[in-house]
Amino acid sequence: MEQPLCILGIETTCDDTSIGVITESKVQAHIVLSSAKLHAQTGGVVPEVAARSHEQNLLKALQQSGVVLEQITHIAYAANPGLPGCLHVGATFARSLSFLLDKPLLPINHLYAHIFSALIDQDINQLKLPALGLVVSGGHTAIYLIKSLFDLELIAETSDDAIGEVYDKVGRAMGFPYPAGPQLDSLFQPELVKSHYFFRPSTKWTKFSYSGLKSQCFTKIKQLRERKGFNPQTHDWNEFASNFQATIIDHYINHVKDAIQQHQPQMLLLGGGVSANKYLREQVTQLQLPYLIAPLKYTSDNGAMIGFYANLLINGKNN
C-alpha cells in the first residue's frame, strides 16, 4: 500500500523558526518559536541574531512537532524570499534531513505559501481561478494574479517600504515594542478617522509607495511629542493610530479594486502577517467577490503554510 503523504514544512525566512507537518492535506503540527523578544531589544530584526536563533531552534521545533521521521514522505522549506542568512540555515537543515531520510526536497516560495495559507482548513474545491493573491506582511506588499497552483504573476508591488515594515517603524516612534502591529491594530476606532488627517499616497495601481506616509507619521509624532504637557505614558494615540491605519490600508484596497477591474478575477486570497489586521480583513470582505483569508494562527510566518503549499503542488501534479 502506498504511504500517505506526510510533508515536513520548514520556515526560517525572518525572525520566526517554524516547523509544520501536513498529513493527507491536514495540519498535524504547527510549531512556531519566535525570537521577537530578542529583536525587541534593538527595535527590529537583526539578521545575524535571527540566523543564530534559527540554528538554536530548528531541532527543538522539530522535536516539539512530534513527527515520526520514518513517516515523512517529503521535506519542504522556504527557499525565497527572505533574509539570506536565515534562508541558508533553513535550507541547510532541510537538505541534511533530506539526505539522512532519503526523501525528496521541495524549495517553496514563501510568498506563494502565504497566499495559499488562506486555503488551510478549507475545501480546496472552493478555489476559483483566475484569482488575486493579496500578500501584506512585514517584508512584502504585493498583488499576484493566480492562474494556477503553479503559475502566479506579480502584478503590483511596493517600490519602497512594505506595510508591515511601516507599522513597526511608526509603532517604534510612538514608543511601542517590536512588533508594533498588534498594538496599533488594537487602537483602531473608525469613528476617529478623518479624510484629511494625512495626505494619501498617490501611485499607479501597479506600485505601492509608503515612504511618504511614513515621513508624515514621523513628523506628526514629533509635533505631538513637542506639545506642552505631552506624557508618552498617558497620551491617547487612538486618533493618530486610527488615521494611520485607515490611510495605509485604504491605499492598498484601492489598488486591489483597480486590479479587480483590470483582471476580472473570480475570487480573492489574502495572507501574510498584516492579514491579521481587523480593518484589512473587514475591507477585503466588502470587495463584492468571493474571498478566503488566512486563519489568524497561520498569518505570521509558519512551517504549516510551507508544507501545505507543497502538498497542493504535489497533489496538483498527480491529478
UniProtKB/Swiss-Prot annotation:
Cell compartment(s), UniProt: Cytoplasm
Main location: cytoplasm
Xref: SUPFAM superfamilies: Actin-like ATPase domain
Pfam family, one: TsaD
Cofactor(s) named in the record: Fe(2+)
Assigned keywords, A-Z: Acyltransferase, Cytoplasm, Iron, Metal-binding, Transferase, tRNA processing
Transmembrane segments: none
Entry's Gene Ontology BP terms: tRNA threonylcarbamoyladenosine modification
InterPro entries: ATPase_NBD, Gcp-like_dom, KAE1/TsaD, Peptidase_M22_CS, TsaD
Amino-acid positions noted as binding substrate in the UniProt annotation, renumbered to this chain: V135, V136, S137, G138, G139, D168, G181, D185, N277
EC numbers: 2.3.1.234
Binding site for Fe cation: H110, H114, D301
Cofactor note text: Binds 1 Fe(2+) ion per subunit.
GO cellular component: cytoplasm
Reactions this protein catalyses: L-threonylcarbamoyladenylate + adenosine(37) in tRNA = N(6)-L-threonylcarbamoyladenosine(37) in tRNA + AMP + H(+)
Coiled-coil stretches noted in the UniProt entry, renumbered to this chain: none
Molecular functions per Gene Ontology: iron ion binding; N(6)-L-threonylcarbamoyladenine synthase activity
Annotated family: Belongs to the KAE1 / TsaD family.
Known role: Required for the formation of a threonylcarbamoyl group on adenosine at position 37 (t(6)A37) in tRNAs that read codons beginning with adenine. Is involved in the transfer of the threonylcarbamoyl moiety of threonylcarbamoyl-AMP (TC-AMP) to the N6 group of A37, together with TsaE and TsaB. TsaD likely plays a direct catalytic role in this reaction.
Protein name as annotated: tRNA N6-adenosine threonylcarbamoyltransferase
Source organism per UniProt: Mycoplasma pneumoniae (strain ATCC 29342 / M129 / Subtype 1) (Mycoplasmoides pneumoniae)
Gene behind this protein: tsaD
